[in-house]
Every structure is written in C-alpha cells, then in structure tokens.
Amino acid sequence: MEKFAPEFHGEDANNRATKFLESIKGKFTSPKDPKKKDSIISVNSIDIEVTKESPITSNSTIINPTNETDDNAGNKPNYQRKPLVSFKEDPIPSDNPFSKLYKETIETFDNNEEESSYSYEEINDQTNDNITARLDRIDEKLSEILGMLHTLVVASAGPTSARDGIRDAMVGLREEMIEKIRTEALMTNDRLEAMARLRNEESEKMAKDTSDEVSLNPTSEKLNNLLEGNDSDNDLSLEDF
C-alpha cells in the first residue's frame, strides 16, 4: 500500500515550518569577518545583505572601487564616465578652398550694423525709385552669390574630381555677377552724385536770388514788344530766334 506525506494544517503547520527554517539557517550563512562592515539595502520591502567586497553604485558618474581598509586609496584616480551621446556640429573640412570665403561672406552680411546713408526723405522720394530698384537687384545678386558659395563648399567637399567642371563654371559665374554688381554700384553712385550736384546748384541759385523781379531773355523781350506794340510790321523771322 502506497504511503503519502503527512499533511499539517493551521498552527501545527506554522510551527513546523518555523522550526525547519531555524534548522537550515546555519547551513547557508557564512561566518562574518569583523573587519568588514555589512550594509543592508531595502528594495521593494526585501532585505538584501551586501558586503564591502561588492559595492553597488546607482546613478553615479564616479567609479571608485577602493574601500576604507586600502592604504593606497588616496593615490588611485577617480574615473569619470563619458556621456553616451554628444551633439557636435561637424566642422567644414580645412582643405576646402571655399570654406574661408563662405565664412567671411556670411560674417560680412550677418554683422552689418552700419546705418544707411540715405535719409528718410531720400528713401521715400518718388524720384529715387530707380535707385532703390538697383539696390534691390544688388541685394538679390548678393543672395545668389551666398547660395553659390554654399554650393561650392558642398561640391568641393566630395572625394572625386568629377565635380571640378561644375565648380569652375560656378566660379566663373560668380566673377561675372561680381562684375555686374560693381557696375550697378558705380552707376548708382554716379546717379547719387549727380543728384547731389543738382541739389547744391539749386540751393545756390535760391540763395543768390533774393528779388521778386523776373528777367527776360532776348527772345522773350522781342515777344513782349510784339504783344505790347500790336504792330503787324514787327513780324518775327526765324533769324530772330
């Protein structure tokens, strides 16, 4: 007849289980070293015994594996962990012949804090539409040059020489546009100088003319005499003019 393990219930089972745990407690515990200090870490209500031989670090960037009993602990350096992810902009290759030109051009037009030499009246004057249109075209061409410089930086960074033709063509186009901009600037400057001369001449004439009298030129005098005399014999010929 088969034998079955005895079953225990209630308080009797609890007492027997307690005695069993006490009997096996000494089999799984090692003698403690009096020189080493133990620490108890509580994780989710579970007590875990950890000795000094296995330090546990959490959320720390400094790793120091030495303990208090080591005499040379002060001589060992602390090792700092490097960040896993770093964001750094890739610099433009130094062997690129157009990188310096592109950088200087960007700095020139981004840091242009000089005030305009035009006054409010000159900017809003209807006679200066042609000048402002020229300046707008110059601004557009400068923007195109900036775009071409950026394209040159990208194109010249390639490892192959297949883009040399494109790069040379763009350099030639850039030189042509710079020459056109120089011509536009000179024409605009000449027009501004001419307007300044006319304005100065008109100012000088207004300063000299202080009387209200109007002087007639010879042709105007003949016409005036003809109208005042009402004489049909005093007809004017082409030679009089």
From Swiss-Prot:
GO molecular function, one term: RNA-directed RNA polymerase activity
Record carries keyword Secreted: no
Binding to RNA-directed RNA polymerase L, as annotated region: 216-232
Region (Disordered): 58-77, 201-241
Comp. bias (Acidic residues): 230-241
One GO CC annotation: virion component
Annotated region described as Binding to protein M2-1, given as residue ranges: 90-110
Positions marked as site (Interaction with protein M2-1): T108
Biased composition (Basic and acidic residues): 201-211
Sorted UniProt keywords: Host cytoplasm, Host-virus interaction, Inhibition of host NF-kappa-B by virus, Phosphoprotein, Viral RNA replication, Virion
Region (Binding to host phosphatase PP1): 81-87
Region listing for Binding to monomeric RNA-free nucleoprotein, in residue ranges: 1-30
Chief location of this protein within or outside the cell: virion
Domain of life: Viruses
Region annotation (Oligomerization and binding to RNA-directed RNA polymerase L) ranges: 120-160
Record has Phosphoprotein as a keyword: yes
Biased composition (Polar residues): 58-67, 213-223
Location of Phosphoserine modifications: S116, S117, S119, S232, S237
Quaternary organization: Homotetramer. Interacts with protein M2-1; the interaction between the two tetramers is required for the anti-termination and elongation transcriptional activities of protein M2-1. Interacts with host phosphatase PP1; this interaction recruits PP1 to the inclusion bodies. Formation of a complex PP1/M2-1/P allows P to target host PP1 phosphatase to the M2-1 substrate. Interacts (via C-terminus) with the nucleoprotein N (via N-terminus); the phosphorylated phosphoprotein P binds to N-RNA complex. Interacts (via N-terminus) with the monomeric RNA-free nucleoprotein N.
Family: Belongs to the pneumoviridae phosphoprotein P family.
Domain comment as written in the entry: The N-terminus is important for viral particle assembly. The oligomerization region is central. The C-terminus part contains binding regions for the RNA-directed RNA polymerase L and the nucleoprotein.
Protein name, entry field: Phosphoprotein
Gene source species: Human respiratory syncytial virus
Gene (name only): P
